[in-house]
Every structure is written in C-alpha cells, then in structure tokens.
Amino acid sequence: MVRRFKRAVKYRRGSRTHGWGRVGQHRKSGGSGGKGMVGFHKHKWSLVMKYGESGTGWPFYGKHGFKQPQAISIEWRPINVGTLAEVVRGLKREGRVKEEGGRYVVNLVELGFNKLLGGGDVDLPIVVYTPAASRSAVEKIEKAGGEVRIVPAVHR
C-alpha cells in the first residue's frame, strides 16, 4: 500500500539520538551496567560494599535463613467445621458413625485430617477427636452441643 506519511525515523536521520536526549538514553540495560544483580562481583562491587551490611555483601550474597528438616516438619491436613458437619451427615447415611449419648463421635485422624478449623457452621452435636483445633472451631462445636477432645498424634 501507499504510505500517506513518512515514517518518523526518516525525519530523525542524522540527529544522533533521534530525540531521546543528550547522551546514552533510550537503551535497554546497557545504560545501567546490566539487568538485576549482574555485575555485583565485577563492575558493581562498590555498590555491594556500600549498601551491603558491614562490608560482607549481605543481603546480596550467601544463604539466608534455614529450611526445616522434613523429619520434624508437620504436614497439616485441616478440615472446617462446616465441611465436617456435611461429612458426618454422609457417614450417618452410610451407617459408619458411632453415637454416644445422642452425639456423633468422629475421629479426624481416621478420616485423614489432623486439624479442625472454624470455617462454616455446624448444627450437629459432634464429639471430635483431633490432634489440633482452632479456638473458633472449639467454640462452634460446643455451641452445637458437641465436644472437642485433643489427642496426641504422630504427624506425617
């Protein structure tokens, strides 16, 4: 197709910076010595010494913090009280939940969970055996006429 106007670059030929200022502007990372942490061991070493902690290069170099060993870390598998109420209703239909004094007895470890959280609403009286529970979960279970019993459990 025929072009109606000349491209702007045609007008800028011969002007050295093509309208981008006096010296060395409108470049990518060349004007700043490289992207990111490039050059911290070479031409930007003075920045590392100036802004790093006591001339050691921290926080730019070295390892920071620690990673907890898998042997002692806990893999939490939580369930909310609202979801637990639905699960108990399903187990009741299947006849897989025990009743004790008009309350349903549930062991969360047997169901594959190890923490009870307070999300949702519960309207069933449930006795819950669990290794850990949040304060709001305990309050909601007790308000519905149930009870939370904390049991020791081996994690993982």
From Swiss-Prot:
InterPro entries the UniProt entry points to: Rbsml_uL15_N (IPR027386), Ribosomal_uL15 (IPR030878), Ribosomal_uL15/eL18 (IPR021131), Ribosomal_uL15/eL18_sf (IPR036227), Ribosomal_uL15_CS (IPR001196)
SUPFAM superfamilies linked to this entry: Ribosomal proteins L15p and L18e
Keyword rRNA-binding tagged: yes
Residue spans of biased composition, Basic residues class: 1-16
Alphabetic keyword roster: Ribonucleoprotein, Ribosomal protein, RNA-binding, rRNA-binding
One term of GO molecular function: rRNA binding
GO biological process, one term: translation
Ranges in a coiled coil: none
UniProt GO cellular component terms: cytosolic large ribosomal subunit
Annotated stretches, region: Disordered: 1-35
Family (UniProt): Belongs to the universal ribosomal protein uL15 family.
Function: Binds to the 23S rRNA.
Subunit text: Part of the 50S ribosomal subunit.
Protein name from the UniProt record: Large ribosomal subunit protein uL15
